[in-house]
Amino acid sequence: DNDQWKRYEIFQDTLGGRPYLFNGGLPPGGSDGSGAPGIDYQVPAEALTNSEFAAIYKEAQKYVGTPYVWGGSTPETGFDCSGYVCWVYNQNGYNVGRTTANGLWNKSQHISEAEAKPGDLVFFEGTYDTPGKSHVGIYLGNGMMVSAGDPIKYANIHSSYWEKHLAGFGRLSK
């Protein structure tokens, strides 16, 4: 049926959420401030039925395995956490420009974890010495995010490291 073809098309476009298996890229891993390797994660198919999130995820997953670059904001330069999120959302018709994690927090509607859905943002404080929000990721649902650690990778926001820095969730508007 048409719905099944749409899901198959999304699967093809996103390479099943595992692009490193298909393009010779690195698997999620390495270390960021958490010291933890990346997690092999596949976004549930039902989350991808939301076309807005599917488009955000399609763009975001292209860069899983890309090394972290402080101040980076394009695929050519590499990404830091806010550069990655800004790139993904700007490519999907959001007008967020290039800002910091704290800047994204200020641009977003603050929501609870219970209200958070795939495609919202998840924010952290104290991941390095800066006032306000110091890290941002794209929430994937089920306690998972994708963010620019080193490299860009999937992570569980309730792991011991991320849990102690969890500061809140935000939703951007077009």
Where do the PLM segments sit?
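Hydrophobic packing segments in regular secondary structure
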Residues: 1-54
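Extracytoplasmic/secreted envelope proteins and their assembly/folding machinery
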Residues: 8, 53, 57, 61, ...
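Acidic/histidine-rich, surface-exposed loop or edge segments in extracytoplasmic proteins
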Residues: 37-40, 63-70
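Solvent-exposed, acidic/flexible segments
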Residues: 46-53, 77-82, 115, 130
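Catalytic cysteine-centered active-site loop
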Residues: 66-118
